[in-house]
Amino acid sequence: MAKDIKFSADARSAMVRGVDILADTVKVTLGPKGRNVVLEKAFGSPLITNDGVTIAKEIELEDHFENMGAKLVSEVASKTNDIAGDGTTTATVLTQAIVREGLKNVTAGANPIGIRRGIETAVSAAVEELKEIAQPVSGKEAIAQVAAVSSRSEKVGEYISEAMGRVGNDGVITIEESRGMETELEVVEGMQFDRGYLSQYMVTDNEKMVSELENPYILITDKKISNIQEILPLLEEVLKTNRPLLIIADDVDGEALPTLVLNKIRGTFNVVAVKAPGFGDRRKAMLEDIAILTGGTVVTEDLGLDLKDATMQVLGQSAKVTVDKDSTVIVEGAGDSSAIANRVAIIKSQMEATTSDFDREKLQERLAKLAGGVAVIKVGAATETELKEMKLRIEDALNATRAAVEEGIVSGGGTALVNVIEKVAALKLNGDEETGRNIVLRALEEPVRQIAYNAGYEGSVIIERLKQSEIGTGFNAANGEWVDMVTTGIIDPVKVTRSALQNAASVASLILTTEAVVANKPEPEAPTAPAMDPSMMGGF
């Protein structure tokens, strides 16, 4: 395929046009008075949203050079969303500001590499100062406040705060569509996995069709149990304790299953068998998780263990197990807390190392099950369009809240970025590096400027007053008042603000140091065959 190539100023200018088109579309959503953007969908009704990354992903420009610029900014939004879960619009606004100011200086003859070094130094100083002025987030009210700011709904803030309180900060909180119009919270405490009983005759409550085991022993194995003789010595030992047994195995079939069912029906022995969750290597990892949670050992050839030789020492224990036809929930496992903490640390390190979104999601689920539960926020709305928009807002709020708990909070509404200007301005740099620092100083003002503009105020006036104010005091664009931002609940997670600035500076620097852009030339359309003269067509 033939290529189209542009150099120097032509290359940068074409990319910057794309940056501006995307940023101008996204930045109208910033702040409490931000507007919505309507996105046409190939099927169904249009999507109305104010979520920066969702809008950025939809933008595709006809001009290849402009499209490359737009895609780079879209990448900033996506990366910020992946790291912090929010702050995508702020990242887009910062990128545009750094690119715009940087391009002026490069065009005037400044060295792009020197500018880049200055930008990197200034951003590092800004990030350090953000961490210095951060306040830790703890307590239900503070968590609810962060979530309410991000979702623009106090009710959603309460749901997320309650969910995190119930399942822990590392717990899985999923967002699903409700069948009704009301949004509600449902929490499953304990470790849950999607495997139900192998026989309905194992239920203890015929009305609810569930089996509830109080203070059970738990046998965990990756083997298939077909012969009852394999586990008979172990069953006899458990029978002496007069406690129920949960069997988690690759499968239970052959003569083993009917024998267990028969003993259950006769009242000899209260036992429930379920298949092991997951597949392949993930199954082994999940069985190990269950073993650590319950204080048991996985009976597997990998450890040189055989079912025939298994003793009571390999069995796990828990306060309660509930099994229905589709799922199993283990509550209050008897595992050692330090062993569980070590397992959680291993899973967290695997999450950081993986590059696969799917693997990260599965690791997050395992982490949550070890940490103590799963919460489901069921979103209700009057129309499908409203439902989609609400789900996006709640996802943003959930990510922002987790980020706040992790690294703390700073004043919201772009105030924190203006608060760090003094520290960045104090940097002693020379030449083009000083120019790079000055570009960052100007860019740090841009989110406040845009929030003020969207709310109908003059940004320059707001910024000048903000620079004279104490740290923590800021402009509430929702009502035009000057307030203590944290006390009023206008806050941003440090992780969100930091990620937005770092990602914006990274991509903007790449654009400024670009000297050539290579794009595919559009292929000429194939000529269409001329229509045949009807008089030349044969008849029957």
Curated annotation (Swiss-Prot):
It comes from the Bacteria. ATP binds at T29, L30, G31, P32, D86, G87, T88, T89, T90, G413, N476, A477, A478, D492. GO terms for biological process: protein refolding. Its EC number is 5.6.1.7. Its main location: cytoplasm. Keywords: ATP-binding, Chaperone, Cytoplasm, Isomerase, Nucleotide-binding. It is found in: Cytoplasm. One of its GO terms (molecular function) is ATP binding. It catalyses: ATP + H2O + a folded polypeptide = ADP + phosphate + an unfolded polypeptide. It holds the Pfam family Cpn60_TCP1. GO terms for cellular component: cytoplasm. Together with its co-chaperonin GroES, plays an essential role in assisting protein folding. The GroEL-GroES system forms a nano-cage that allows encapsulation of the non-native substrate proteins and provides a physical environment optimized to promote and accelerate protein folding. Forms a cylinder of 14 subunits composed of two heptameric rings stacked back-to-back. Interacts with the co-chaperonin GroES. Belongs to the chaperonin (HSP60) family. HAMAP family: CH60 (MF_00600). This is Chaperonin GroEL. The gene is groEL.
